[in-house]
């Protein structure tokens, strides 16, 4: 399946926090045999959220949105999602009743309980704001522990595909292996090959759905590296 990840938050765009949520989900999805088509970061703006979610829902099989589900003034993601699908924002009775036992702040409880009409609730075991699913979009809290808790439940819904990965470490600079690497890329179109330079060495990752094709590409690359001609 193809996924698009949308991270919502002014604090990400300003550089105040690092977007670890997107990296976490992308890695999990990839290793489950899925493809992440793109990762988008957008501000806490209802209109932008609505526009980007509407577009993403048409481009991908499923969309994962994080951030903006709390009780403060800038938590507007639920409203943006509702607008994206022309749905009313309604109070989830089950969420409202549960939160009312935890807090006497009526305004906060009502805001966190508000979801697009027809949403399915995904309970958050480590925080107040639950996730919800509407059409082909899942919306999760932005706090990493809460995102991980709800994301794992959502990920279980999708059948795992084949995924195989091997990594080769090459000492020296990337420029030394470019020609050989390009040859392997040309010869192995079904294998995704990434080159990641580090101080003093390069990590080359080979991945794909077919284990034998991945191994074949790795073998070819290692043979080319050993060929000193």
From Swiss-Prot:
The organism of origin for this protein: Archaeoglobus fulgidus (strain ATCC 49558 / DSM 4304 / JCM 9628 / NBRC 100126 / VC-16)
Name of the protein in its database record: Protein AF_2251
Family matches, as Pfam families: FLAD1_M, MoCF_biosynth
Top-level taxon in the UniProt lineage: Archaea
Alphabetized HAMAP family for the sequence: CinA_A
Disulfide cross-links: none
Family: Belongs to the CinA family.
């Amino acid at each position: 399946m193809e996924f698009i990840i949308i991270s919502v938050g002014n604090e990400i765009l300003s550089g105040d926090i690092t977007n670890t949520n997107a990296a976490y989900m992308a890695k999990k999805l990839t290793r489950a045999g899925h493809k992440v088509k793109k990762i988008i970061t957008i501000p806490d703006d209802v209109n932008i959220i609505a526009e980007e979610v509407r577009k993403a829902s048409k481009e991908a099989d499923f969309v994962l949105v994080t951030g903006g589900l709390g009780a403060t003034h800038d938590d507007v993601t639920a409203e943006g999602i509702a607008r994206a699908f022309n749905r009313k924002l309604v109070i989830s009775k089950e969420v409202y009743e549960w939160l009312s036992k935890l807090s006497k702040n009526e305004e906060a409880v009502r805001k966190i309980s508000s979801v697009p009409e027809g949403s399915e609730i995904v309970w958050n075991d480590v925080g107040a704001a639950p996730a919800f699913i509407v059409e082909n979009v899942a919306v999760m809290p932005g706090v990493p522990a809460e995102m991980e808790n709800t994301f794992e439940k959502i990920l279980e819904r999708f059948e795992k595909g084949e995924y195989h990965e091997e990594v080769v470490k090459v000492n020296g600079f990337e420029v030394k292996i470019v020609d050989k690497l390009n040859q392997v890329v040309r010869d192995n179109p079904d294998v995704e090959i990434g080159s990641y330079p580090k101080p003093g060495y390069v990590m080359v990752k080979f991945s794909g759905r077919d284990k034998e094709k991945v191994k074949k590409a790795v073998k070819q690359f290692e043979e080319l590296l050993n060929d000193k001609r």
